[in-house]
Amino acid sequence: MTIFVSCAAYRDTELPNTISSLIENADHPENLHIGVVQQCQPREKVDFSKNSHVREVWMASKFAKGAGYARSVAQSLYKGEDWFMQIDSHSRFDKGWDTKLIHMHSLAAGSASNSKIILSQFPKAYIREGNHDELVVNEKYPAHPTKQKVLWATRRVWSAERVEFDDQSYSVPEESQTVLAGFIFAPGSLVNDVPYDPDISFFGEELCYAIRAWTRGYWIYSPNEQVLYHFYTRPNHHKIWDAANNSDKKWGGLEKKSMDRQAAIYRGDILGTWGAPSLSLLNEYYEFINTDVPGIYNEMLNDRG
């Protein structure tokens, strides 16, 4: 079964190793089609011209508009593959990750009696030391599987926090409240049913996506086995909001537009393609996560005012 992998990168030196790890550790690399969006300087561009797995779009980093826009562009490279996977450009993979994810998706679909399942969770952690990777395991970054619940984060954006599995034997995937954008695995139908919003720049993207997916019948489960790694925080690596990459000060405007759009989605002012299909379904999701998202968000806006 074919897998389309969406990978957006912003001036990320980890990108080539991410793509190599993805392909080399798959049981069936012949089934992989990878949509890469490189946002970088011309001299930084990775040459994938001889990699038959990769379809790509390159844009100069000055035209970057955040993760949402880049992930939306990556989805435009999808060509009807059976499965859709979204990763960050600083990821690593365990052997057989593709076979394991398809199997765990089947387990989750069986538990839920619903084939429209999104697998998502916080990946394990790694860091790049010189020319090799090192696994990081500590209280903040455990190696065992966890679920996620919606969190009002310290940045005053909606994010997620880790929650332990109910079944500590980790026999089957368990339901979660929201997605992690750096690891999504679902049927390929997700691309057309829930296209990525290009106008949500970065912070807060995941709750809006979870709202749109869940209210369209896609339930979110966390895999019962960890199969990939993420380079968290990445000190001294390029970020689009860093001063050196934001000399024209456009990031603040993009984030303001993004936050306003998120608020409209939370309140139900935006319904349809870019929001929940209806207010009743939106409220069902808030009941599911047991959180008054628009109320908390409005309190924050009032505090700022």
Predicted features, each with a name:
Residues 2-299:
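Catalytic cores of eukaryotic secretory-pathway lumenal/extracellular enzymes that build
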